């Protein structure tokens, strides 16, 4: 049975985040930027190639990961999250920069985060070229930190995936997540006040989808890609679909990992779908699903 906990009550407003994006749109687009509001911003390198860039923060997951001795997972999260965003436009990752901002510098803590990020970068063939470490007493409380990263990739203009060719009847292929990944932890921590959870998928690092995306592109015509982060499956698919088209999701077409069954005891179904990936970490819109798990259709 769904409970009463919501993301808003936990201190995070997705509606306000959406409003901020729209408020900033004119200023950002006035600089000549392409792809504002997409998973990755685009910059023309020359007539044939585009740079794709994405930046994100790990949010409040480190607060829980540190308590359980799994801070390294958050470094892996951050690298995978940014690389996954860049993949959505068809780009290959080139390099990553990281930003670590704790209340006070802790060598072991910084090393865990950067080593976790480096492990994912090695797997992706993406260079970790540098970053910034800032000690910010007075900004964060004792023991608190922020960890962010920026990934830059490269895509040939002819290979760009932007959702423009999506048509009614196209299939939505769902790729499984490793667990909660890196979104919704303010709400997770609120639920933990009522009931503990020890399963590995709660703090498992974000899955890297590079090999999956490459395989899909070899096997079938990929028309859009969505990284399922804050906003859930439907919210993130809507970011890559042409105006007037929607994704009808069959929520019974896959089995949810146990961590989401635990959350469902405290969070209403609509809120679960709006905040969490619910076991689907990445979506591809394709004409032919090529034997993959279909979780919905475009209409």
Task: Name these PLM-found stretches.
Residues 185-196:
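Short, compositionally biased
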Residues 2-11, 20, 26, 108-127, ...:
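Glycine-/charge-enriched secondary-structure boundary and capping motifs
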Residues 14:
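Conserved "HGTGT" condensation-loop signature of ketosynthase/thiolase-family condensing enzymes
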Residues 172-180, 225-230:
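A structural signal for small-residue-enriched, beta-sheet-centric alpha/beta enzyme cores
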Residues 180, 188, 297-299:
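Flexible glycine-rich active-site/ligand-binding loops centered on an Asp-His dyad
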Residues 17, 58-62, 156-159, 180-182, ...:
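Short, acidic Gly/Pro/Ser/Thr-rich loop/turn segments
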Residues 23-178:
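Glycine-rich phosphate/pyrophosphate-binding loop regions near the starts of catalytic domains
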Residues 160-163, 183-187:
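A short secondary-structure junction signal
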């Amino acid at each position: 049975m769904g409970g009463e906990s919501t993301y808003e009550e936990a201190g995070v407003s997705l509606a306000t985040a959406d409003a901020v994006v729209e408020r900033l749109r004119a200023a950002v687009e006035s600089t000549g930027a392409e792809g504002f509001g997409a998973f990755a911003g685009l910059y023309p390198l020359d007539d044939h190639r585009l740079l794709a860039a994405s930046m994100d923060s790990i949010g409040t997951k480190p607060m829980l990961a540190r308590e359980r001795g799994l801070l390294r997972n958050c470094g892996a999260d951050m690298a995978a999250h940014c690389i996954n965003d860049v993949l959505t436009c068809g780009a290959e990752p080139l390099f990553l920069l990281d930003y670590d901002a704790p209340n006070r510098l802790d060598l072991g803590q910084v090393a865990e985060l950067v080593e976790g990020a480096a492990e994912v970068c090695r797997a992706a063939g993406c260079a970790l070229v540098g970053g910034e470490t800032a000690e910010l007493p007075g900004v964060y409380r004792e023991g608190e930190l922020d960890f962010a990263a920026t990934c830059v990739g490269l895509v040939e203009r002819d290979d760009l995936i932007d959702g423009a060719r999506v048509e009614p009847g196209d299939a939505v292929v769902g790729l499984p997540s490793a667990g909660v990944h890196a979104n919704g932890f303010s709400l997770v921590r609120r639920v933990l006040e009522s009931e503990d959870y020890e399963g590995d998928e709660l703090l498992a690092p974000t899955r890297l989808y590079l090999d999956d995306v490459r395989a899909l592109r070899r096997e079938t015509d990929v028309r859009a890609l969505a990284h399922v982060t804050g906003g859930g499956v439907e919210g993130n698919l809507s970011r890559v679909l042409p105006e007037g088209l929607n994704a009808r999701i069959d929520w019974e077409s896959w089995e949810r990992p146990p961590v989401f069954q635990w959350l469902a005891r405290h969070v209403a179904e609509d809120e679960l779908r709006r905040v969490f990936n619910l076991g689907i970490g990445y979506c591809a819109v394709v004409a032919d699903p090529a034997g993959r798990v279909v979780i919905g259709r475009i209409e």
